[in-house]
């Protein structure tokens, strides 16, 4: 049996792409992505529920983000779910969930 970690999302970027350049020449792009779902509540009203996802990309994919993905751009991505942690300035362990993007498709919009 093959186990797979694969995420596919379509949504709108919520901020400008943040770039980090590493000493070894590699680059990292970070951006948030909003996806929305709708449901009907007990009063019969349609309610929109938005989820925010943290995306990271490296290398050529990061360069595509930098050049072609402004705030508010509709994109489709494929990648894998990743988890990491760090200790903040007060020594408290913080946990981060991110999607490491392997493929990006630029869609309509801005």
Residue ranges and their predicted role:
Residues 1-110:
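Single-stranded nucleic acid-binding surfaces, predominantly the OB-fold ssDNA-binding core
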């Amino acid at each position: 049996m093959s186990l797979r970690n694969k995420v596919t999302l379509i949504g709108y970027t919520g901020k400008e792409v943040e770039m980090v350049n590493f000493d070894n020449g590699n680059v990292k792009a970070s951006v948030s992505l909003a996806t929305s779902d709708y449901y009907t509540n007990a009063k019969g009203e349609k309610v929109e529920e938005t989820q925010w996802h943290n995306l990271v990309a490296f290398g050529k994919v990061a360069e595509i983000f930098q050049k072609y993905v402004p705030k508010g751009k509709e994109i489709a991505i494929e990648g894998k779910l990743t988890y990491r942690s760090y200790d903040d300035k007060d020594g408290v362990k913080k946990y981060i969930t991110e999607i490491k993007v392997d493929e990006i498709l630029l869609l309509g919009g801005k």
